[in-house]
Amino acid sequence: YTQEDYDHPNQTVTFLDNHDVTRFGYTQRSQKVYNAALAVLLTSRGIPTIYYGTEQYVIPSDASDVAGRVYMPTECGFSTTTTAYQLIATLSTLRRSNDAIAYGTTTVRYSDDNVMVFERQFYDDVVVVAVNRQPDSASVIPAIQTNLPTGQYSDYLDGSLFGTATTVQNNLIPSFTISGGGVCVWQYQASEAPSTPQIGDVISTTGRPGNTVHIYGDGFSGNISVYFGTTAATVQSTTANK
């Protein structure tokens, strides 16, 4: 809905909370909704920022930003087994491996008062995320269009947020029921490296002659030439994705 509001949406820094605002755990006490919000943050466009303690469901004593700056060893402890911690780890891995999340376009495939299904796509890489923000009521989602290829897709989160598998045929996800607070993540990655470079992001977007520019994407192995307009740039180094 806000694509036209940003020149470079994939470079925006996104967050649920930080040191200048109220802790998300203070305003949202339902862990189902909390986890669903984390899933959306980590699969949406932009650069997600995770405030320390978010993975521990920190709830401060009041709504001030100061109260949110807890001293972890004595005020909340640290566990690597919380659902939030595991969710952040799992979806961070997906962000690194599937370029649809880092660079892809966003298409809202379905939305109502409680549920949103959105699709991220970068060339042949596709990720579909279905989220029910209502923690207590399941919703039935009608069949929806998708760019996922025909095939069976397990929930990338292995059901940790009550997600289920799906089977795609002819670019259609069949009707499904999503549990209260549920999140489904289905993903597809192209099996072969691209034959031509696929540019995902360019940083920085402004500069002057002599500045170093970083180009991210896929298919950059081998001899690569870079031009800005008709001016050839000196390529200092390349990897498959940078």
Model-derived regions, located:
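Alpha-amylase-like alpha-glycosidases and glucanotransferases acting on alpha-linked glucans and related
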Residues: Y1-I47, Q56, A63, I101-Y103, ...
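Conserved, mostly hydrophobic/aromatic
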Residues: H19, L41, G53-E55, L91, ...
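C-terminal accessory region downstream of the catalytic core in glycan-modifying enzymes
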Residues: M72-G77, A84, I88-T93, A143-N171, ...
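Short proline/glycine-enriched turn/loop motifs at strand-loop junctions of beta-rich domains
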Residues: D136, T146-G151, D218-I224
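C-terminal beta-strand-rich structural cap/linker in extracellular carbohydrate-active enzymes
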Residues: T166-T196
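Beta-strand/beta-sandwich contexts
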Residues: E192-S225, T231
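Aromatic- and carboxylate-lined catalytic core of secreted/periplasmic carbohydrate-active enzymes
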Residues: Q3, G68-D113
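Carbohydrate-binding surface patches
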Residues: R109-N147
